[in-house]
UniProtKB/Swiss-Prot annotation:
Its main location: membrane. It is a multi-pass membrane protein. Residues 1-127 are extracellular. InterPro entries: Neur_chan_lig-bd, Neur_chan_lig-bd_sf, Neur_channel, Neurotransmitter_ion_chnl_CS. Keywords: Cell membrane, Disulfide bond, Glycoprotein, Ion channel, Ion transport, Ligand-gated ion channel, Membrane, Postsynaptic cell membrane, Receptor, Synapse, Transport. Belongs to the ligand-gated ion channel (TC 1.A.9) family. Acetylcholine receptor (TC 1.A.9.1) subfamily. Alpha-1/CHRNA1 sub-subfamily. Disulfide bonds join 33-47, 97-98. This is Acetylcholine receptor subunit alpha. One of its GO terms (molecular function) is extracellular ligand-gated monoatomic ion channel activity. It catalyses: K(+)(in) = K(+)(out); Na(+)(in) = Na(+)(out). It comes from Natrix tessellata (Dice snake).
Amino acid sequence: ADGIFAIDQFTKVLLNYTGHITWNPPAIFKSYCEIIVTYFPFDEQNCSMKLGTRTYDGTVVAIYPEGPRPDLSNYMQSGEWALKDYRGFWHSVNYSCCLDTPYLDITYHFILLRLPLYFIVNVIIPC
């Protein structure tokens, strides 16, 4: 989120009759991925993004993915990369500081396949 972590607008929450609360804060997350260029421009990259809270533990806040795959309804295709596969995994971790307290996160893995046409036409063929 560009290093700005404050949400500067009020957002509503959904409250279920069971007491379950859903909050969807407006945010755009940006991440980076270490690129391995051994097979460039015919490479694929495995990038991950971990979402969780370190402020509240798993006894206070429960987070769960809606399904095994993230929602890509706002995904925009790229001319350089194709999304080959993507998955989300739920984790409960007990750190050495507090072994009886679980901390929850969801880690999303994205496998990106480089589309090599640009590099073939502009870099490889002219050589």
